[in-house]
Amino acid sequence: MKVAYLVNQYPAVSHTFIRREIAALEAKGMVIERFSRRRSEHGLVDEDDIAETGRTTVLLDANAFALILQTLSVLVRNPLRFARALWAATTMGFRSQRGLLRNLGYLVVACQLRDRLARSDCKHVHAHFGTNPAAVARLCALLGGPGFSFTVHGPEEFDNVWAISLREKIQDAEFVVAVSSFGRSQLLRLCAVEQWPKIVVVRCAVDDQYLRIDPPSIPEAPNLVCVGRLCEQKGQHLLVQA
C-alpha cells in the first residue's frame, strides 16, 4: 500500500519522530511518499534528515504560475468538488486566526497535492499535525483525493479547537491518532460517540539505535539534560522547578 505523509515542514530538526515513524512503516512493507507544504526554515544537521530532503516533495516549491494553473485545472475538471472544498476553506478561514487568505492558500496547496497523488497512486494521506497539514489533507480529500487521517499531539490543537476547525477535521477523517490516552480523551469530547472507535492512540517512541547505546556510568553529581524546543508548549520552566 502506498501512503502519503504530509507535514508543514519536513524534514526538520524537531520532526525526527516523524522520520522514525515513516521508517518503521517502510520496514513493514509500506511505500511512503513524503510531502512538505514548504521547506524547513532551519538548517539540517542530522545525516538522516539531510537524506530525507531528497525523498521529499515540497509542494510550494512550484512557482506561482504553476500553482495557479494547477488550481484552475482542478476547478475545470470537477467544479462541484472544487466548490465544496472552497466552501470548507472559506469556513475554516473565517474562524482561523490566520485569516481567510491563508486558508485559500491551503486550497491551492491541496490542488497541487491532489495532482501529485493522482500521479503517484497513493491510497491514503496521513498528516502531522491537526493544524494546517490536516486542513490541506481535508481539502485534498474534498477535491476527490484519497481519504485522510492525522496525528494530534497537543496542546496547541486543544487550545484552538474552534479556530482550526478541529471538529470538522475529525468528522471528515478516516481515523485520528492521539499520542497519549489524555490526548484521545480530549478528542473524544469533540465528536459523536459513533466516531469514538476511529480515535486511536499511537505513542511516540525511540528506535533501536537509541536502545543499543551502552548506558553511561553514573556520575557523582546529578547531570540532567533536557532536549526540546524553547516554547511554551514544552513547559521548560516547569521542568526546572520540578
Residue ranges and their predicted role:
Residues 6, 153, 179, 202, ...:
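Short hydrophobic "strand-cap" motifs at the C-terminus of beta-strands
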Residues 98, 148-174:
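A conserved, positively charged/aromatic
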Residues 99-115, 122-143:
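An aromatic- and histidine-rich active-site surface loop
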Residues 1-65, 146, 171, 204:
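N-terminal subdomain of nucleotide-sugar transferases
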Residues 18, 25, 224, 239-240:
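A structural motif in glycosyltransferase catalytic domains
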